[in-house]
């Protein structure tokens, strides 16, 4: 095939300019011209320009019909590309090869088999258009998988017809084509676009489509489509995806400011609807992505026992979060299939939402259990309306322009959300200690055990105050004895000594219950490894989780993350929280006792005779009642937690 220099657009080809790369060449087998192949793949926009330029040149040099073949794998963007050309050149005609499918030839549900195409009718239509005659193009119904009629197509005024389909560059059609164009894209986005297209066009269930992709689409692509695409003169690598177009995005304003339900209701129309939801969002990391920088998570949401797969990407236009989202219901079995394809679980977030919706905008509060934070969100399709509602709520100046998964990435909380808390992993043990009295030994041992527990799993800001307070509790009885030895004996101090002794006995009893408490946690903690089967790989580790409808969810993931969702771990977390609350009560009780004893001693030293009656009345009424109530509350709380 020789280059005809007499028709070349430029005697000096300048490869730096795209318009100069689109060159004509004359065919050896006919007097028609075609495009010199462009070696490097072009982007979506550059490919669009190159195709428009090529069509204009071909229309200038060739007589009759200009037939353009546009091929590519399912969901790669062929239809979007042809529609873009049609908007720019309304006088062209488009023939979609999907309309030439013959439903009677379908074998095992494989709609991408090349034998499914009715080439006889297609070739008759092409030859009819070349002869300048109107033709009857079939109409194919994807829901019924059958041909339901015909439409009349006449030769367009521009004489340009685009033949679009996965086999538009097949060997049977190539001799008739004046221009060959291929469109391909990434596997991840091809999957998304295929699901999106088929849901809208065929009404198929998403699970069926994904199974269809894995079983038929890619094998057919490798065997029949990919070899034809190599013959294209213009190759387009489509990085365009359903999200980057933002045809129907959701605008979100998020704030950490506290807003009451009454304020939310006042900002909405009168016909708003109110509801509450509890959701579990499982964020799936695509293969090869960095968990700290990924912006294209797949999110599987569990709500009311139903699972939805959500494709979304986020763009921040401060203070807005723009989220083009695609959601469809799937079976829980899909999670295992995606993980088998290389997806991994990045994190699982539990969210409780209080939602107010008036069809124009959604206002809701989200409480995230793992982050222990509450946020208010205003969401809607109208950017201006969302901003107005947020202003009515007084959110200006308090916006958080980050999604929840971005906040985890930015605050480096991934490990905190994925792994079990360190304090639940710490083994609770009791060290022997030699002290002067059995009561002090029991109390000191319990305190030492708890101090080791706290140092192993709680921050220094929490443990340091306890280090100063708890020893005062353990030495309370000893200090009282030393104080009484220096003070003169009186009728008031004798009942006081008996009261302190009784109080010490009660505290010792409480410490014994605390020991039982810590033993219970240790027992529960020891059960954790028994619930998890050891495995050398994350992907082979399975944990059964029951959802609301009784079905069993089994999927591969990090052991520490999945155990967190188990009933055993919920019990351990509740027990640990109860223990911390009891320890705070013990701190408060210790401080009260120290203040009371110090005040009593000071008063006795100043005026022993004058304060005897007052101290006796105080001890006989107010103090025993207050301290008795405090100890009783702590004891009841501890006993209920043990139960």
Swiss-Prot record:
Membrane topology designation: Single-pass membrane protein
An MF annotation (GO) of this entry: inorganic diphosphate phosphatase activity
Residue ranges of domain CYTH in the record: 248-410
Signal peptide: none
Role of this protein: Exhibits pyrophosphatase activity with stronger affinity for pyrophosphate (PPi), moderate affinity for ATP and ADP, and weak affinity for tripolyphosphate (PPPi). No activity observed toward uridine substrate. Positively regulates natural and dark-induced leaf senescence.
GO BP: any one term: defense response
Name recorded for this polypeptide: Inorganic pyrophosphatase TTM1
pH dependence: Optimum pH is 8-9.
Gene3D superfamilies reported in the protein's UniProt record: Hypothetical Protein Pfu-838710-001, P-loop containing nucleotide triphosphate hydrolases
Pfam families: CYTH, PRK
Transit peptide start and end: 1-15
Organism: Arabidopsis thaliana (Mouse-ear cress)
Highest taxon in the source lineage: Eukaryota
Subcellular location(s) of the protein: Mitochondrion outer membrane
Keyword flag Nuclease: no
Induction: Accumulates during leaf senescence.
GO cellular component: mitochondrial outer membrane
Major subcellular site: mitochondrion
PROSITE patterns reported in the protein's UniProt record: CYTH
Keywords: Hydrolase, Membrane, Mitochondrion, Mitochondrion outer membrane, Plant defense, Transit peptide, Transmembrane, Transmembrane helix
Annotated EC: 3.6.1.1
Phenotype seen when the gene is deleted: Delayed dark-induced and natural senescence.
Catalyzed reactions: diphosphate + H2O = 2 phosphate + H(+)
Membrane-spanning parts: 618-638
Tissues of expression: Ubiquitously expressed in all tissues, with strong expression detected in senescent leaves.
């Amino acid at each position: 095939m020789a280059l005809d220099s007499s028709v070349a657009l430029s005697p000096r080809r300048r490869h730096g300019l795209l318009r100069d790369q689109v060159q004509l060449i004359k065919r050896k087998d006919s007097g028609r011209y075609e495009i010199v192949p462009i070696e490097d793949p072009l982007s979506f926009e550059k490919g669009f320009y190159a195709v428009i330029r090529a069509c204009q040149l071909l229309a200038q040099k060739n007589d009759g019909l200009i037939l353009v073949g546009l091929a590519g794998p399912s969901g790669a963007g062929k239809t979007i590309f042809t529609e873009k050309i049609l908007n720019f050149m309304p006088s062209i005609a488009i023939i979609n090869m999907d309309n030439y499918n013959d439903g009677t030839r379908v074998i095992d549900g494989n709609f991408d088999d090349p034998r499914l195409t009715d080439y006889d009718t297609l070739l008759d239509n092409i030859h009819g258009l070349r002869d300048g005659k109107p033709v009857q193009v079939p109409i194919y119904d994807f829901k019924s998988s059958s041909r339901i009629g015909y439409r009349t197509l006449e030769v367009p005024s521009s004489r340009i017809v685009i033949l679009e389909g996965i086999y538009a560059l097949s060997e049977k059609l190539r001799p008739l084509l004046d221009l060959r164009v291929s469109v391909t894209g990434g596997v991840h986005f091809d999957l998304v676009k295929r699901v999106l297209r088929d849901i809208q066009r065929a009404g198929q269930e998403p699970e069926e489509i994904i199974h269809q992709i894995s079983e038929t689409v890619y094998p057919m692509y490798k065997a029949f489509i990919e070899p034809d695409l190599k013959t294209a003169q213009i190759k387009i690598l489509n990085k365009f995806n359903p999200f980057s177009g933002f045809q129907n995005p959701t605008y979100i304003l998020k704030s950490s400011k506290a807003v009451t339900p009454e304020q939310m209701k006042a900002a909405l129309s009168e016909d708003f609807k109110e509801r509450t939801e509890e959701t579990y969002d499982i964020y799936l990391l695509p293969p090869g992505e960095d968990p700290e920088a990924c912006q294209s998570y797949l999110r599987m949401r569990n709500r009311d026992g139903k699972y939805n797969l959500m494709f979304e990407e986020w763009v921040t236009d401060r203070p807005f979060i723009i989220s083009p989202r695609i959601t469809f219901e799937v079976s829980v079995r899909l999670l295992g299939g995606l993980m088998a394809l290389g997806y991994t679980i990045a994190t699982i977030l539990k969210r409780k939402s209080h939602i107010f919706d008036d069809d124009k905008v959604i206002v809701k509060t989200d409480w995230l259990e793992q982050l222990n934070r509450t946020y208010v969100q205003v969401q809607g399709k109208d950017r201006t309306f969302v901003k107005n509602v947020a202003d009515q709520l007084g959110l200006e100046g308090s916006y958080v322009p980050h999604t929840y998964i971005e906040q985890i990435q930015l605050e480096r909380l991934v490990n905190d959300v994925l792994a079990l808390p360190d304090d639940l992993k710490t083994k609770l043990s009791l060290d022997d200690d030699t002290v002067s009295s059995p009561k002090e030994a029991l109390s000191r041992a319990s305190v030492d055990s708890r101090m080791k527990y706290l140092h192993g799993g709680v921050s220094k800001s929490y443990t340091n105050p306890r280090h100063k307070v708890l020893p005062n509790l353990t030495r309370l009885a000893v200090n009282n004895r030393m104080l009484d030895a220096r003070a003169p004996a009186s009728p008031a101090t004798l009942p006081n000594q008996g009261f302190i002794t009784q109080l010490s006995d009660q505290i010792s009893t409480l410490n014994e219950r605390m020991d039982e408490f810590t033993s219970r946690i240790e027992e529960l903690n020891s059960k954790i490894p028994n619930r998890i089967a050891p495995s050398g790989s994350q992907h082979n580790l399975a944990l059964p989780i029951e959802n609301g409808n009784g079905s069993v969810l089994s999927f591969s993931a990090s052991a520490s993350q999945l155990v967190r969702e188990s009933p055993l771990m919920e019990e351990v977390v509740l027990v640990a929280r109860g223990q911390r609350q009891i320890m705070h009560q013990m701190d408060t009780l210790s401080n009260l006792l120290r203040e009371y004893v110090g005040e009593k001693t000071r008063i006795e030293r100043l005026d022993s005779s004058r304060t005897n009656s007052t101290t006796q009345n105080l001890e006989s009424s107010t103090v025993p009642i207050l301290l008795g109530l405090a100890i009783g509350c702590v004891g009841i709380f501890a006993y209920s937690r043990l139960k």
